[in-house]
Regions:
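Transmembrane helix boundary and interhelical loop/hinge segments in multi-pass membrane proteins
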Residues: 24-42, 192
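Terminal transmembrane helical anchor/hairpin motif
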Residues: 1-8, 126-192
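Membrane-interface elements of multi-pass transporters and channels
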Residues: 32, 76-84, 114-118, 134, ...
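Alpha-helix N-cap/start motif
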Residues: 48-49
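Secretory targeting signals
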Residues: 1-28, 52-119, 125, 154-173
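Alpha-helix N-cap and coil->helix boundary residues
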Residues: 33, 37, 68, 122-123, ...
């Protein structure tokens, strides 16, 4: 066993953490709909777009802190027992998975605004990821999908280069922005 094996395992385990994250935060709006606490906040003068940004920011912050903590523990563990220099594309691979998580957060916010049920948010988020994942099976579409970022562990061993993921990174950032814009637009018109 070496640091490369440990990092490969780290990137295989991140999807589990992301699934748990989705289950924890899919109710971020739906609980407010059920208890009508969102109406109280809005009647006190808080803008709807600020509510959307606040919810996104909370999830973004929790994902970033949790992810960086897991990364730091793994990095320290590998530095203590082995040499991290064997993993050549470690930083880009880490950023790609983090960005993939940010896209998931954008989807959670979008579906939380679109539907009023926890199950609907889970199905919408999971269905979107599954749909994009299936699209990535087409060789010509692979480099354009956010799910490409899940395969960035191949950067560790040098079978792919950072340039192979450039378009996917830009499209993922664009999709996060689109999710937020659509969420704010729908939230501004939504009857609560």
């Amino acid at each position: 066993m070496n640091a490369l094996t440990s990092w490969t395992q780290f990137f295989k385990n991140i999807p589990i953490a992301l699934i748990v994250f989705v289950f924890l935060y899919s109710g971020i709006f739906t609980k407010e709909y059920e208890t009508n606490t969102l109406i109280l906040i809005l009647t006190k003068g808080l803008s709807r777009y600020k509510v959307v940004f606040a919810k996104f920011f909370v999830m973004f912050t929790m994902w970033t802190i949790g992810y960086l903590l897991c990364f730091a523990v793994t990095y320290g563990y590998n530095a203590f027992f082995w040499d991290n220099s064997i993993a050549v594309g470690l930083l880009p691979a880490m950023v790609h998975w983090w960005l993939f998580g940010v896209w998931i957060i954008g989807l959670i916010v979008l579906f939380s605004v679109l539907v009023k049920s926890y199950t609907g948010v889970l199905l919408g988020t999971g269905g979107s990821v599954l749909g994009v994942y299936l699209i990535s099976f087409f060789p010509k579409a692979w480099k354009y999908t956010p799910t490409t970022l899940m395969e960035s562990a191949s950067l560790l061993i040098g079978t792919k280069s950072i340039e192979d993921y450039g378009i996917a990174v830009l499209i993922t950032i664009l999709l996060v922005v689109i999710c937020l814009i659509v969420s704010i637009t729908v939230m501004n018109r939504k009857q609560l």
